[in-house]
């Protein structure tokens, strides 16, 4: 394996079968568990507009979080290498998901607002 390649692995278990599987669109829960070895389990669901549990993280939350985290970590690394001392960092990120005619959707905008 190339030493520059980093592999990531997880197990995703759908836990939302209420007894009838996906026999109807309304009849199953969107709840699931993401398991990554050595880390706490992450219980997730769909966004409420897709019949998910509003108290759980959804893929859209996690995509926005991943973008914000990547920006933070890159910024901190660049500052450290340039001997710029960062004492605090907060990002108030927002994303816009546009629904498509077929019921799906796509992000059309992500705005990061870091405060250093």
Predicted regions and their residues:
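Extended beta-strand/beta-hairpin segments
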Residues: 1-65, 73-116
């Amino acid at each position: 394996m190339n030493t520059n390649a980093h592999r990531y692995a997880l197990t995703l278990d759908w836990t939302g079968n209420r007894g009838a599987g996906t026999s109807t669109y309304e009849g199953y829960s969107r709840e699931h568990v993401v398991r990554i070895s050595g880390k706490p389990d992450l219980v997730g669901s769909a966004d409420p507009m897709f019949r998910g549990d509003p108290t759980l993280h959804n893929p859209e939350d996690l995509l926005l979080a991943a973008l914000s985290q990547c920006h933070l970590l890159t910024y901190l690394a660049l500052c450290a290498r340039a001997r710029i001392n960062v004492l605090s960092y907060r990002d108030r990120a927002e994303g816009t998901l546009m629904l498509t005619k077929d019921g799906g959707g796509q992000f059309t905008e992500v705005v990061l607002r870091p405060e250093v």
